[in-house]
Regions:
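Short glycine-centered segments of the SAM/dcSAM-binding site in methyltransferase folds
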Residues: 238, 261, 382-384
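Beta-strand cores of modular interaction/reader domains in eukaryotic scaffold and signaling proteins
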Residues: 72-74, 241, 263, 294, ...
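Conserved nucleotide-binding/hydrolysis micro-motifs of P-loop NTPases
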Residues: 269-270, 301-302, 338-340, 392-394, ...
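C-terminal catalytic and target-recognition region of SAM-dependent MTase-like enzymes
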Residues: 319-322, 326, 385-465
Length: 465
């Protein structure tokens, strides 16, 4: 009887349900398993950029994951210039223009006399490509379209393969455009940019106000000055910064004291407010610039200088009222919204890799191409458009440039020339690593442990007809 009872007890025990209580959302084990938006961004970059950049991706990745990146200081021309320069130099900072001129002179004075021009040109190309000597051959834009993520992305209406969207831009990959060499990078007289040498991670002191009541210098990522320099600003230029927030590049342009007209535009009120804040903090005697500086809130895809800017600015620019009936912009900076590759690895806030922004991220190249296309359509003959992103994505970089050039060629009779700036940038290779990962149109400064700034892609396009 006892044996029977024991068997029954065992059967009843076997039927008992064991209830397991999960840990709360804030428990360390749950948090550890939870994938953040930053994790998703890194996973995407590993899958995508690993294929595009080959073995070089590992070192780029290491630099990107370091939270503190390297800045340069743009001296405020509206403050006490000589004092500021002296103070920055006392901290060990060097003037970027001086560095460029020293290395440019060294290159000019030490050509190889014993070798043919062909050999020297080959060596120059090898130096530019030295960064990727260990990378996979022929990776880059041509191999980009083979990238297919392992997972599908749920859109609002249907399932979308990320590669299907990117594949749309394959159409412009083989589009040919005239190419012209640029041999010199021009530094405007009043644009003073200071940096620390390679492997020096010193931080600039906090900027203080000078005798004119504005801050002494503006800190920005060291690679962000390159698109501004590529504009090749000249006295009297009319300049448009299409996507200007937070305002660092607009401010850098103003520091040259060259623009006769400066228009800083962005699409949202909050972003426009950031531009205005920077201008108020750094531009003294704003009244003197009231008739030359304008901050606008417009969608860059639909800016029409013959219409919108004539209406917005003719009340300020009486002298130019008639000129605004035709195209007037001689320089346009197109620093488009992008995946902001460094930022998304260090901030959860409003991260473009969060699920709610999937469709926005997939549509980025389409948006970028539309903005660049519009810029190319409104630039004046002889004018320069500089397109830039802080992304490593060949789709957002060369891919977008190719699509925009193709569209302009199809829809207008304009003639565009893409500037090959390899020679002009060569003296800056002491500070920047310019990777040539199959790029056809532009240039890219990639992050390194020695100088951890960037990434920054930029492409200079000039309209000749």
């Amino acid at each position: 009887m006892a044996r029977l009872f024991n068997r029954q007890a065992i059967k009843d025990l076997a039927k008992m349900q064991v209830v397991r209580y999960g840990n709360k959302a804030d428990h360390w084990s749950v948090i550890k398993k939870k994938k953040t938006h930053m994790d998703k961004a890194l996973k995407h970059f590993d899958e995508f950029y690993g294929d595009v950049y080959g073995k070089s991706w590992e070192s780029i990745r290491t630099a990107l994951l370091i939270k503190e990146h390297k800045y340069m200081a743009v001296v405020n021309s509206f403050s006490d210039i000589d004092r500021i320069k002296s103070e920055l130099e006392s901290h060990g900072a060097m003037n970027l223009k001086a560095i460029y001129e020293i290395y440019k002179k060294h290159i000019d004075e030490n050509p190889s006399k014993s070798k043919s021009n062909k050999t020297k040109n080959k060596q120059a190309k090898n130096r530019i490509k030295s960064l990727i000597s260990d990378a996979e051959p022929n990776v880059g834009l041509s191999g980009l379209y083979e990238f297919v993520p392992a997972t599908k992305i749920k859109g609002m209406e249907d399932w979308i393969l990320e590669s299907q969207h990117y594949g749309y831009y394959k159409e412009g990959a083989n589009f040919s455009v005239n190419n012209e060499k640029e041999v010199l990078l021009t530094f405007p007289q009043y644009l003073n940019i200071y940096t620390f040498e390679e492997n020096n991670d010193s931080r600039f002191p906090s900027s203080k106000k000078g005798s004119t009541g504005v801050l002494d210098y503006y800190l920005l990522d060291g690679a962000s000055v390159l698109p501004v320099l590529a504009l090749d600003l000249q006295p009297g230029d009319a300049v448009l910064d299409m996507c200007a927030a937070p305002g660092g590049k607009t401010l850098s342009i103003l520091q040259t004291l060259m623009p006769n007209i400066m228009v800083a535009n962005d699409i949202q009120k909050s972003r426009v407010n950031r531009i205005n804040k920077v201008i108020n903090q750094y531009v003294a005697g704003i009244g003197q610039w009231e008739d030359r500086l304008c901050v606008t809130e417009r969608d860059a895809r639909f800016i029409d200088d013959k219409d919108m800017y004539n209406k917005v600015m003719h009340r300020k620019f009486d002298f130019f009222r008639e000129i605004f009936i035709i195209t007037i912009f001689l320089q346009i900076l197109v620093d488009v919204p992008c995946t902001t590759d460094r930022h998304v690895l260090h901030s959860e806030e409003n991260n473009i890799f969060k699920p709610q922004r999937i469709r926005e991220r997939l549509k980025l190249p389409e948006l970028q191409a539309a903005i660049l296309t519009n810029a190319l359509k409104i630039i004046s003959v002889g004018g320069t458009v500089v397109y830039s992103t802080c992304s490593l994505s060949p789709i957002q970089n060369d891919g977008v440039v190719g699509m925009a050039l193709k569209k302009v060629w199809e829809e207008t009779n304009f003639i565009m020339i893409v500037k090959d700036m390899s020679e002009a940038l060569s003296p800056l290779k002491c500070l920047y690593k310019f990777g040539n990962f199959g790029l056809k149109y532009g240039h890219i400064a990639i992050p390194t442990l020695q100088n951890n700034w960037g990434p920054m892609y930029f492409c200079k396009i000039v309209r000749t007809r």
